[in-house]
Regions:
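Conserved two-metal-ion catalytic palm core of "right-hand" nucleic acid polymerases
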Residues: 1-157, 172
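PAPS/PAP-binding and catalytic site of the sulfotransferase fold
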Residues: 88-92, 230-233, 237
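Right-hand nucleic-acid polymerase module
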Residues: 78, 87, 224-228, 245-328
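Gly/Ser/Thr-rich beta-alpha loop segments that engage phosphate groups in nucleotides
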Residues: 34, 179, 183, 265
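A generic structural signal for residues located within well-ordered alpha-helices
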Residues: 80-84, 184, 188, 257
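Intrinsically disordered, low-complexity and often Lys/Arg-enriched segments
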Residues: 1-10, 235, 322-328
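Conserved polymerase palm-domain catalytic core
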Residues: 44, 51-52, 103-104, 109, ...
């Protein structure tokens, strides 16, 4: 992996910090901490820059809350000032990480996303007889900091930047785990499994492969090849990344049975939304309709909800055979 210099200076550039503030504030300008930092940006950003340059910057405590989407998740929300730092760091590091990633890694990347991952998966299902679908047990919570920092340090050679990355990674709990919700966590988690992507493509020579963060799907012409790959993948994850597969979610089956992937079931000629996702969407629409009838939201908000729910169906040709616009 190529190592780069001059990155810390680019992160501290006043223009980069100012742009990071604007990106972090997008869609959140009505919140008090955001308004406060925007109002004080003339003094707050230079002060933040001084802390970063001196190595005295320390993140503030996280605000934590739980969601169920559909399974329970603990979300850690960084202080707005720290989110500005995350955006400033990612503006410089993300393009370097991006160069490492294979084309069929679809999470948290511009021009990718879950819909394109589904279409790509369907393209592979049309050309192979069997699939292997699996994911990582407690992925974000299991990311080893020593292993992750070694991967990040391979990108940058400046001690000051390495110290800043260690501060971000080790907060709030040192040793293991990344908080779900941070922009840095998304990019770092994507990089962490990049070794697996290159192993699948360059060592095992498997062309039929799609990853969406910790959801992995592989295709082959015979199930014996996939059983062997699953065993090798378990060994690689344990030895190199201190991770393990969810055995109860590891499936090897004919493509004609449909592969569960990202809330959908992928068939060679059809994409079908799975029950839990569909029920969540219906409940959301019922809530929005009730809010509209009660006068709590306007017609524009209700229409936004309807468009958001209908968008994936239109893009994916939900419920009918697809004529894919993606080159597979």
């Amino acid at each position: 992996m190529k190592s780069y210099g001059g990155l810390f200076e680019r992160i501290l550039d006043p223009a980069n910090l100012d742009a990071a503030l604007e990106r972090a504030a997008r869609g959140k300008r009505e919140r008090a901490p955001v308004q406060r930092l925007l109002a004080e940006r003339a003094t707050a950003l230079p002060r933040l820059r001084e802390e970063l340059a001196a190595g005295t910057y320390r993140p503030r405590p996280y605000e934590q809350f739980s969601i169920c989407d559909p399974k329970p998740r603990r979300i850690s929300c960084a202080h707005f000032r720290d989110r500005v730092v995350h955006h400033a760091v990612c503006a410089v590091l993300a393009p370097l990480i991006e160069r490492r990633l294979i084309a069929d890694n679809y999470a948290c990347r511009e021009g990718k996303g879950s819909h394109r991952a589904l279409l790509r998966a369907q393209g592979f299902a049309r050309r192979h007889g069997w699939y292997l679908k699996t994911d990582i047990r407690r992925y974000y919570d299991s990311i080893d900091h020593v292993i992750l920092l070694a991967k990040l340090y391979a990108l940058c050679r400046e001690p000051a930047l390495r110290r800043l990355l260690a501060v971000i990674v080790e907060h709030p709990i040192p040793g293991k785990g990344l908080p779900i919700g941070n922009l840095t966590s998304q990019w770092f988690a994507n990089l962490y499994l990049d070794e697996v992507d290159h192993w699948v493509r360059e060592v095992e020579r498997i062309p039929g492969y799609v990853r969406y963060m910790d959801d992995l799907a592989l295709w082959a012409h015979d199930k014996e090849r996939l059983f062997a790959l699953a065993a090798d993948l378990r060994a690689l994850l344990a030895a190199r990344l201190a991770l393990e597969l969810k055995e109860e979610r590891t499936l090897i089956a004919p493509v004609g049975e449909g592969m569960p992937f990202l809330g959908w079931r992928v068939y060679p000629g059809l994409l079908r939304q799975q029950g839990p996702r569909l029920r969540r969407q219906r409940r959301l629409l019922v809530r929005r309709e009730a809010q509209y009838l009660a006068g709590e939201i306007g017609a524009d908000k209700l229409q936004d909800c309807v468009r958001a729910l209908a968008g994936p169906r239109k893009f994916l040709g939900y419920g009918e055979p697809l004529r894919s616009t993606i080159d597979v």
